[in-house]
Amino acid sequence: MAELLLELLSEEIPARMQVRAIEDLTKLVGTGLAEAGLSHGGLRGFVTPRRLTLVVDGLPVAQPDVHEERRGPKADAPDKAIAGFLGSLGLTRDQLETRETPKGPFLFAVIERKGRPTAEVLPEIIYRALTALSWPKSMRWARGQFTWVRPLHSILAVFEGAPLRGAIGLGVSLEGLPVGFIADPAAAPEGTPLLAFGATTRGHRFLAPEPFPVRDFADYAARLRQAHVLIDREERKRVIAERAAALAAGEGLRVKDDPALLEEITGLVEWPVPLMGHIDKAFMDVPAEVLTTSMRSHQKYFSVENADGTLNARFVVVSNMDATDSSARVVAGNERVLRARLSDAKFFWDQDRKAPLAGKVEALGARVFHAKLGSDLDKVTRVRAGAAWLAARVPGADASLVDRAALLAKADLTTGMVGEFPELQGLMGRYYALHDGEPPAVAQAIRDHYSPVGPGDACPTAATSVCVALADKIDTLAGFWLIDEKPTGSKDPFALRRAALGVIRLIVENSLRLPLREVLGSAISTYGDRMLAQCGKADGTSSDVIEHDLIAFIAERLKVQQREKGVRHDLIEAVFSQGGEDDLVRLLARVSALADFLASEEGTNLLSAYRRATNIVRIEEKKDGKPVSGDPDNALFEQDEERALSLALDTLLGEVSPSLAAEDHAAAMRALARLRGPVDAFFDRVTVNADTPALRNNRLRLLARIGTAMATLADFSKIEG
């Protein structure tokens, strides 16, 4: 068994593309090996900013020989049919055999194909993988037809300790002919730009740029380490995290946890060397979030915190150089660059506070929210109306505070700081509002009205924040539904799925008793008759359609959210599909009670009985060609089990309605559980298909009534399992 080592050395690959690229390359080469019939012991992929590396263990030195038999047409088939069979295999008539079969004599082809040496097959597999690898962005160079994310410098391809034979044509020959894979580089047309497979690589761009040969993966990894390259991404990540933490701990500090930044920096360096620098004290009065964001987004520095979580005037930079002798110069250079960056941030901070936040609201009129939905100022007007409607319905909400927060919520979008750092929207509004003397509840709502932005984000709980956050998200959903800009498939350019999940969390986590139809209807009405007319939605029917469609959309997002929390989606569907239920708190309470009921022995058995009853009714309806309708006639009951079941159903209906009205869902389920005994007894002792037609029809009506009674709690036909 032999080993294949493949390395593609290029200019720097963007960090965000690296992991996907090595995964795709591994998959493409693996597929090529399988198609070529080459078994192996596994593929391992490695990626650095400049190289994609793949090692395949346990390869055979040659493909297996192939023995294959193909049955063709009958021996006396027309010549045209036989010729077609021969043409498909590339054989002649004398190479076929005639064999007797139970269906008569048939022609057979016996194909013997000797396996090719693996060293001949691998270059073709590699070429196909390279040309099939898709990058989000790619480029050509020289006279290139071949594309790669960045100019490709070399291809190391070593099998059994020797370089594979072959090359990739990077463009066209002097005659203008396109060039692809070349099995023999020496035979390539003169002047053809080639990238030949070889057995050499290079180390760190600056610390070890000279080429050196390698024999196998062990030699490759060891020599690259000597050449200041760690090819294992996880090792580089671990080195960065551990050494940065050690630097901070040596000062009694800690590195601010930032997994995304750690991932990005891992893709920027081949030889990570964390170093600690200082932030000029003159910038420490700027909000910590601004400093952290500037260091993170512009410089890729880790922030450093004190033991209490406050920002310290230190940072960690990860150098791509072995800075043993020059670490002081590296740190000083980074501190100098950071001072320039933070000077800009401090300028915005000082300038933005010279005018009150309220004075910036009118400037929102110059910002387009959406071409069909008006400006950001138009959105603020709608959000104020929606928030006022909610303030009258959210417990503890102060209408004046809610209105003020809604008015100022988007004002920081016009500031220099948010223009430079859009991710600080809302947060800067809070700082500026507090500076202006706005009430803390208003400032908090300005910050929180974008939340929650993801499943891990905290959900606002303060009444003022909840009103503004909910009004903002509902307005967004209503507006984009109004202009038919809905999510399709995997595309959701306006983050409407996230907005819907935000609506769900705000309502459910704050136990808000808000009928969705009323909430959505109020939001749609804020667009005004003129806007509705422009969108062709002026009539009430169209508005109702939007409400219905939006509720269905929110219901789907609710299923996704609850499924991720371990709740069965079919139970949500069973409750939601009854129609008329748009109170999410009540709906989930009923779903929870239904889940508990179905987990019990009574629930499991009653569900089976329900299915048995509905199946019998459906089968008999099909036989009769008409639906079972009407209530059973008590006078036709002949057995005690019929009477007991009918009485149990009457009792159930009498108990369920008051329980549901009181939102005592557990009591409703207990009432349902008491139906099990009469149902089991009925099926044990009563023959539904009685000889007398009237008796049979009456018993079918009684069975149908089981489904009708249970449907007052949920649509049990939607329940799976």
Curated annotation (Swiss-Prot):
GO CC term, one of those recorded: cytosol
Keyword annotations of the record: Aminoacyl-tRNA synthetase, ATP-binding, Cytoplasm, Ligase, Nucleotide-binding, Protein biosynthesis
InterPro entries: DALR_anticod-bd (IPR008909), Gly-tRNA-synth_bsu (IPR015944), Gly-tRNA-synth_heterodimer (IPR006194)
One GO BP annotation of this record: glycyl-tRNA aminoacylation
Catalytic activity of the protein: tRNA(Gly) + glycine + ATP = glycyl-tRNA(Gly) + AMP + diphosphate
Keyword check for Cell division: no
Enzyme Commission number(s) from the entry: 6.1.1.14
Tagged with keyword Protein biosynthesis: yes
GO molecular function, one term: ATP binding
Domain of life: Bacteria
Entry's localization field: Cytoplasm
Alphabetized PROSITE patterns for the sequence: AA_TRNA_LIGASE_II_GLYAB
Family: Belongs to the class-II aminoacyl-tRNA synthetase family.
Subunit field text: Tetramer of two alpha and two beta subunits.
Protein name, UniProt field: Glycine--tRNA ligase beta subunit
Originating organism: Rhodospirillum rubrum (strain ATCC 11170 / ATH 1.1.1 / DSM 467 / LMG 4362 / NCIMB 8255 / S1)
Taxonomic lineage: Bacteria, Pseudomonadati, Pseudomonadota, Alphaproteobacteria, Rhodospirillales
